[in-house]
């Protein structure tokens, strides 16, 4: 169980709102095209209002001192999307290891779970410890130049588990 699961989460009532156009985000969303069960394309890009307010301030400052922008790679995820991506990551890890698996016996493969849980929170339905992205308070962000190109930052975590197969 990841450390964040031990931290009780209480909803502070901050509204989940659409990310404004002054912030850049990937379009189309990489998980949408994998078949992640978002209700529709317009429901994808949301965060808690306070998170957005802080991101706007950071982005404005970044633009004022450089030619970079924040580029949001992922934001709020409904629990159904979290579950879809978690299961997909497990299947891809099993495929890489040539393991035939069902979700009923996943606990028999702790090494697979350990790899997946490095990047994906378990899709918990417990309201006291939801996956961070499902709260609307977590996001994945990169830097882009003024033309929208990703800035190399030493890691391509953004692309993990988003290609059609693990061999791509």
Name each region found by the language model.
Residues 91-135:
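Acidic, His- and aromatic-enriched active-site or binding-groove loops in soluble protein domains
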Residues 26-44:
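Acidic/histidine-rich, surface-exposed loop or edge segments in extracytoplasmic proteins
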Residues 158:
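Surface-exposed loop and adjacent secondary-structure segments within mature catalytic domains
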Residues 1-9:
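N-terminal secretory targeting signals
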Residues 44-82, 87-92:
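Active-site acidic/histidine clusters and adjacent loop/turn architecture
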Residues 67-69, 136-140, 150:
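Extracellular structured ligand-interaction cores
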Residues 161-168:
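Conserved small/polar residues in nucleotide/adenosyl-binding loops
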């Amino acid at each position: 169980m990841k450390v964040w699961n031990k931290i009780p989460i209480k909803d502070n009532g901050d509204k989940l709102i659409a990310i404004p156009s002054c912030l850049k985000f990937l379009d189309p969303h990489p998980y949408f095209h994998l078949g992640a069960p978002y209700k529709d394309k317009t429901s994808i890009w949301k965060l808690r209002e306070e998170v957005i307010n802080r991101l706007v301030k950071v982005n404005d400052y970044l633009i004022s001192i450089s030619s970079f922008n924040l580029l949001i790679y992922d934001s709020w995820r409904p629990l159904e999307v979290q579950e879809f991506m978690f299961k997909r990551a497990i299947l891809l890890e099993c495929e890489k290891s040539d393991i035939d698996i069902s979700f009923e016996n996943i606990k028999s493969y702790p090494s697979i779970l350990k790899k997946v849980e490095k990047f994906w929170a378990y899709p918990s339905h417990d309201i006291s410890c939801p996956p961070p992205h499902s709260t609307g308070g977590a996001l994945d962000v990169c830097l882009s130049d003024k033309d929208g190109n990703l800035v190399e930052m030493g890691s391509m975590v953004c692309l993990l588990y988003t290609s059609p197969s693990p061999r791509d």
